[in-house]
A protein has these predicted regions:
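Catalytic cores of phosphodiester-bond hydrolases, prominently lipid phosphodiesterases
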Residues: 22-382
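Bacterial N-terminal signal peptides that target proteins for export
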Residues: 1-6
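Bacterial N-terminal signal peptides
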Residues: 7-15
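Sec/Tat signal peptide C-region and signal peptidase I cleavage site
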Residues: 18-20
């Protein structure tokens, strides 16, 4: 949320992304991947995986009102393919931003919409909505959380041997400062806070789509261990042989929203999502480390934790064709490397984030575990 507030100083929030447009080549696995554990591989994911850029007329409108917003507008200029098409091309980690809408219709008439804007009728239904920023950056390939989950479920059922898919969920409720509204002569729809009841809604909507046997939850990972942290440090993560065809969720938020989600659920017992908890705490299993240069990543990976990092941010790397951050992300050992550019945007540069040979996954370069040392690290895993 602090990053978003910095973004509001320019205009509004935080954003990234682009679309993949070419098929992913997947080779045959020449080794028994069933013995490999989930934390011993590395995959590429996408950030704001639902995103479609704002219409040109809306971008022009805000640039005219606030010329300083031009630079921020550039960070909104990306599009993602529908989730099922991303999965077809090898993406195994996505992120969905959700807004609470228990009555329905709160975001059905975006104030930045034009006469040509198409709004899904599902925006009038009660339930969580998926988009980036109310009234401005609201276009989405799956505007409701349930709709996104149904897309994931259909694809997973049709491809039951797929590697586990991690879905990051960010609960968004930041208020737009009044001074920003005045500067833009634009009144924003203020979001509903994510209290305990609204956080429970996330779990309820997930469980309404996915049966327990299709989920990797804190309970399944903890097993008989005293705490979730103890389980991942001693027993380890599930093997791929028992994890294929399954989905796991993690809460992107830290701070107050994370604490609200974990309160009353020691070691996340009964919860669906993992959280980025303090190292060593009972709930510690997954960590969000956006900065791939963060030296704590390799330390966390060596202790058995899952880590997600980012290869790029705010379109900077693609515009400058700078691969330093991407290369650091790959080398860090983080199991999930998130990008806005799983393929290059030729209008910007050749910058892209993919493994050699465009394989779907590879042995973790830091924590090899069950991956053999005598095979290339970029071998493909279906």
């Amino acid at each position: 949320m602090k990053i978003e507030l910095l973004g509001y100083l320019m205009m509004w929030g935080l954003v990234l992304g682009t679309a993949r447009s070419t098929p992913l080549e997947v080779a045959t696995v020449p080794w028994n991947s069933g013995e490999v554990r989930l934390n011993e591989i590395q995959l590429v994911g996408t950030h704001n995986s639902y995103h479609l850029e704002p219409e040109e007329t809306l971008k022009t409108k805000f640039i005219e009102k606030s010329p300083l917003s031009r630079q921020y507008i550039k960070t909104l200029e990306y599009n993602h393919l529908p989730l099922n098409e991303q999965f077809d091309r090898g993406i195994r980690q996505i992120e969905l931003d959700v807004f609470a809408d228990p009555v329905g219709g709160r975001y059905a008439k975006p104030r930045g919409a034009t006469a040509n804007t198409q709004i899904s009728a599902r925006m009038n239904e009660p339930g969580l909505k998926v988009f980036h920023l109310q009234d401005v950056d609201f276009r989405s390939t799956c505007p409701t959380f349930l709709g996104c989950l149904q897309t994931v479920k259909r694809w997973s059922d049709a491809n039951p041997n797929h590697l586990p898919i991690l879905i990051l969920v960010e609960a968004k409720d930041s208020q737009i400062p009044r001074w920003v509204e005045k500067a833009l002569s634009f009144e924003f729809t203020q979001p509903i806070p994510f209290d305990e009841a609204q956080l429970d809604t996330i779990d309820l909507e997930i469980r309404s789509i996915f049966p327990e046997h299709q989920l990797i939850t804190p309970d399944t990972v903890r097993g008989d261990a005293a705490t979730l942290n103890q389980a991942v440090r001693t027993q380890g993560w599930p093997r791929l042989s028992t994890s294929r065809g399954k989905i796991m969720f993690a809460l992107d938020n830290e701070g107050k929203i994370r604490d609200r989600y974990t309160r009353g659920y020691p070691s996340l017992a009964g919860r669906v999502m993992f959280v980025s908890a303090p190292p060593g705490s009972d709930e510690a299993a997954f960590f969000k480390r956006n900065n791939p240069f963060d030296r704590s990543i390799s330390h966390l990976v060596s202790q058995g934790y899952l880590v997600r990092t980012r290869a790029d941010a705010d379109t900077r790397e693609a515009r400058s064709n700078n691969t330093k951050r991407r290369d650091a992300a790959f080398a860090s050992g983080a199991q999930f490397v998130s990008t806005d550019y799983p393929v290059a945007n030729p209008a910007l540069s050749d910058y892209a984030v993919a493994f050699p040979g465009n394989v779907a996954a590879r042995c973790n370069p830091f924590n090899t575990g069950g991956c053999p040392f005598d095979l290339p690290r970029d071998i493909a895993i279906r």
